[in-house]
UniProtKB/Swiss-Prot annotation:
Tissues and organs where the protein is expressed, per its UniProt entry: Expressed by the venom gland.
Modified sites of kind Leucine amide: 17
Single GO MF descriptor: toxin activity
Protein name stated in the entry: Bombolitin-5
Chief location: secreted
GO cellular component terms given for this protein: extracellular region
Origin species: Bombus pensylvanicus (American bumblebee)
Compartments in which it is found: Secreted
Length: 17
């Protein structure tokens, strides 16, 4: 599991809200 990758996906999701 890539923590930085997950944080990146979460950041993208939040920016799309």
């Amino acid at each position: 599991i890539n923590v930085l990758g997950i944080l990146g996906l979460l950041g993208k999701a939040l920016s799309h809200l």
